[in-house]
A protein has these predicted regions:
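Generic recognition of short, well-ordered alpha-helical interface segments
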Residues: 4, 8, 22-29, 43
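A short, compositionally biased N-terminal segment around positions ~18-40 that is enriched
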Residues: 18-38
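Residues that form or immediately flank small-molecule/cofactor binding pockets and catalytic motifs
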Residues: 8, 53, 86
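Non-catalytic effector/regulatory segments
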Residues: 9-10, 38
């Protein structure tokens, strides 16, 4: 599975690289887990509703969430990250 970041999500990721190594480590662990099994595991994965239907959320910290969706099939799947800072 490939991973792609929206530009704002990439900015969020760079923020964690510069500001908080512990949160960055947690985020990296969640991203790896999402690539293995996007809909189960740590971070309390939950499907989002409303205008975010089709997207999933996992807790990074009490305040921050990872928002993502999976597109494609088989080896062509992509984990698309929309946000990894703040709450949706």
């Amino acid at each position: 599975m490939k991973i792609s970041f929206w530009p704002t999500a990439w900015d969020d990721y760079l923020y964690w690289q510069a500001e908080d190594e512990k949160t960055l480590a947690r985020l990296n662990a969640l991203l790896k887990e999402c690539m293995r099994d996007p809909f189960r595991g740590t971070g309390k994965p939950e499907p989002l509703g409303g205008n975010l239907a089709g997207w999933w959320s996992r807790r990074i910290t009490r305040e921050h969430r990872l928002v993502y969706r999976v597109g494609g099939k088989g080896d062509g799947q992509t984990l698309e990250v929309a946000q990894c800072r703040y709450h949706y």
